[in-house]
Amino acid sequence: MSNIIKQLEEEQLKQNVPSFRPGDTLEVKVWVVEGAKRRLQAFEGVVIAIRNRGLHSAFTLRKVSNGTGVERVFQTHSPVIDSITVKRKGAVRKAKLYYLRERSGKSARIKERLGA
């Protein structure tokens, strides 16, 4: 029984997901439905958390928009996601960057990972 479920989940996994780590800056293009129209909306932010659970994998992006912190959780293999692009690689030493929520300005910056 579990082999059938595992096989169905493997068929639904996306193959074009780039590798990224916490601290990286990503641009995620998402399909948004407004009435009868369908359009792409971009969300660019820093990865503050990754949850690896096969088909149920997710990652959290954080950006500051007009002085307000905005966080959004994306399901990695969701059909709503059109593309994921790595804009910048960040050098951090923790897996979860929740401490960025309390920081602002220069202390919220992340160094760039060199040689990656």
UniProtKB/Swiss-Prot annotation:
PROSITE patterns: RIBOSOMAL_L19
Name of this chain's protein: Large ribosomal subunit protein bL19
One term of GO molecular function: structural constituent of ribosome
Lineage of the organism: Bacteria, Pseudomonadati, Pseudomonadota, Gammaproteobacteria, Pasteurellales
Signal peptide from the UniProt entry: none
UniProt family annotation: Belongs to the bacterial ribosomal protein bL19 family.
Organism (species): Actinobacillus succinogenes (strain ATCC 55618 / DSM 22257 / CCUG 43843 / 130Z)
A GO CC term attached to the entry: cytosolic large ribosomal subunit
Family annotation (PANTHER family): LARGE RIBOSOMAL SUBUNIT PROTEIN BL19M, RIBOSOMAL PROTEIN L19
Keywords, ordered alphabetically: Ribonucleoprotein, Ribosomal protein
Purpose: This protein is located at the 30S-50S ribosomal subunit interface and may play a role in the structure and function of the aminoacyl-tRNA binding site.
GO biological process: translation
